Curated annotation (Swiss-Prot):
This is Putative rubredoxin. GO terms for molecular function: iron ion binding. SUPFAM superfamilies: Rubredoxin-like. Its cofactor is Fe(3+). Keywords: Electron transport, Iron, Metal-binding, Transport. InterPro entries: Rubredoxin-like_dom (IPR024934), Rubredoxin_Fe_BS (IPR018527). The keyword Glycoprotein does not apply.
């Protein structure tokens, strides 16, 4: 069994050997060189992700859009651990790349946007959206918003759009803090 090191996608060894050179993971978009050997298929889903999913769905059912007050705090906690540079979005992107959350994150400082590719949470986020849960738990979005708020003094509205094997996250100023 081969398993994608980014998103956990699994493919049997026999099928892997038949893949063409240009093949990319259907879930996160990395090349086949990012698939690793595994003695046996993963049994079930990662328990921590199941717990996180249950908390997210529960928050959404109870609070709806109000759950964003809780999930924004997640970004603030992560922002406390980021080395801030001249470019707050790049600082946040570098942190997530360094910790293996995504294969690449490009930043557009002028338009306050992140383009996250090969996200390790992509499949998780898509499953939440398919279940009707507005995704407010994105660590990239919440952390980048917290870093921007700290450096500019403004609050930001977050908008996420689907990109190629990830999301494009845009931030728009809404008010002074």
């Amino acid at each position: 069994m081969k398993i994608c090191r980014i998103c956990g996608y699994q493919i049997p060894e026999g099928e892997f050997n038949l893949l063409e050179d240009g093949w990319v993971c259907p879930r996160c978009g990395v090349g086949k060189e990012e698939l690793q050997d595994s003695a046996e298929p993963l049994g079930g889903r990662d328990p921590l992700m199941l717990i996180f999913r249950a908390m997210t769905v529960g928050l959404w059912r109870v609070l709806g859009n109000g759950s964003q007050g809780v999930t924004r705090e997640m970004g603030s906690v992560i922002a406390d651990n980021i080395r801030h540079g001249d470019d707050p979005l790049k600082s946040a992107a570098d942190y997530f790349i360094e910790h293996g959350f995504a294969a690449s994150i490009s930043t557009d400082t002028e338009n306050f946007a992140l383009n996250v590719k090969n996200c390790s949470f992509y499949g998780f986020c898509c499953s939440l959206e398919e279940d009707g849960v507005l995704l407010s738990t994105c660590p990239y979005a919440n952390t980048a918003a917290a870093v921007l708020e700290r450096t500019t003094g403004y609050r930001y509205r977050i908008k996420r759009n689907k990109g190629d094997h990830g999301h494009i996250i845009e931030f728009s100023r809404i008010s002074k803090k």
